[in-house]
Structure formats: structure tokens, C-alpha cells
């Protein structure tokens, strides 16, 4: 994949004098919660409202998100606040439902990035759309997986791309929940110099 300035034009189109800010609840739990937070954020520097609709959990029986009903809440956020919206997608059906509900930005989570099959399924489902797609780093510090995900999306003619640095899981004791391993996002930015990179907090 060649270094391509078109990959970041979507970010330039925001015409911001500050970094792009994406904020919102980790999980959408109720319509009231989502709308209350969105209204509190609308007059800040936040440009995109985020909320997890589907939550990938390690074990069954844990809260796995409210599901598709939450997309209706995101639609209300757009209507009432004017904020753009984003949520995580992990398969082709998620993509279909998000597009049907006019979600502006789709992100692929760290657990999905580790699977070329999942990334390819999502890339195929997004082909021909004009959505902004953000790809989190894989759970493990594997640069090739991150590159591969970017390349799969780009090969499906998805040109509004960005990456999210969330840090990496580690078996060793650390003061961080996720180790930054800064050399990896730096390597990605050097290889794809015009690809927007965001930091997950």
C-alpha cells in the first residue's frame, strides 16, 4: 500500500484548530444515559460521539451490550445534538445495521484486529461505502497484524482510514492496563505517514 494523502483528507475536512476529540460512554446502557451524555458534550470540543453497542467479552454471561436498539439512540444523538456518531463493529451484520442507522464512523476493536478473517469480512461489508473506519491496534504487539488490517481495508476501496493506539496486553506486571509499546504506533506512522493516528484513553 502506497503512502496516500487521501487517507487523511477526511480528518482535514473537519477544519479543526485542535485535535479531533471522540468521546462518550464505553457502553450504551440506556437511551437516557446516552442522550444525557451527548447533550453534555455537544458544546465542548467533541466532534464525534462514541458508544459501544456490542461489547466483546472474554466470557459468556457478562454484559455484551444492548445490541441494535442502541443504534436508534445514536441516531437520536445526531438529530438532537448534531454530533457525528461512532461505534465498534465486529462482523458484517454489525456493519449493515450501523449503516442502516446512519452511524458516521465505524471502529474495529483490538480483539477483531487480531483475526484477518474478521477484518476481511468487515472490509467486504464496507466496500463501496464512504464511511470513516478506525482500526485499533491488535491486542498483542504484532505490527504485521496491524499493517495487514490497514491493507485489507484499503484494498476494499475504503479510503477514509485512521488507526487507534490503545496499547497492548501483557502477561508481565505493568503500571499500565495496556502497555503503550510506543515503538509500534511510531512504526505505523512512519510507514503510513498520512494515516491519522488517535490515542485511546
Residue ranges of each PLM-predicted region?
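Catalytic alpha/beta core domains of metabolic enzymes, predominantly
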Residues: 132-193
Amino acid at each position: 500500500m502506497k503512502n496516500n494523502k487521501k487517507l487523511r483528507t477526511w480528518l482535514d475536512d473537519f477544519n479543526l484548530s485542535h485535535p479531533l476529540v471522540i468521546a462518550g460512554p464505553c457502553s450504551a446502557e440506556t437511551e437516557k444515559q446516552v442522550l444525557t451524555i451527548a447533550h453534555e458534550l455537544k458544546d465542548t470540543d467533541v466532534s464525534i460521539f462514541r458508544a459501544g453497542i456490542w461489547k466483546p467479552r472474554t466470557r459468556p454471561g457478562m454484559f455484551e451490550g444492548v445490541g441494535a436498539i442502541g443504534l436508534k439512540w445514536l441516531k437520536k444523538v445526531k438529530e438532537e445534538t448534531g454530533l457525528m456518531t461512532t461505534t465498534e463493529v465486529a462482523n458484517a451484520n454489525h456493519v449493515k445495521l450501523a449503516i442502516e442507522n446512519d452511524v458516521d464512523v465505524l471502529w474495529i476493536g483490538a480483539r477483531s484486529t487480531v483475526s484477518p478473517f474478521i477484518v476481511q469480512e468487515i472490509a467486504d461489508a464496507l466496500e463501496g461505502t464512504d464511511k470513516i473506519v478506525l482500526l485499533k491496534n491488535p491486542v498483542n504487539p504484532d505490527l504485521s497484524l496491524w499493517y495487514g488490517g490497514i491493507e485489507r481495508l484499503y484494498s476494499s476501496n475504503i479510503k477514509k482510514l485512521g488507526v487507534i493506539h490503545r496499547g497492548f496486553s501483557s502477561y508481565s506486571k505493568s503500571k499500565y492496563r495496556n502497555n503503550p509499546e510506543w515503538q509500534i504506533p511510531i512504526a505505523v506512522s512512519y510507514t503510513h505517514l498520512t494515516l491519522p493516528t488517535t490515542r485511546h484513553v
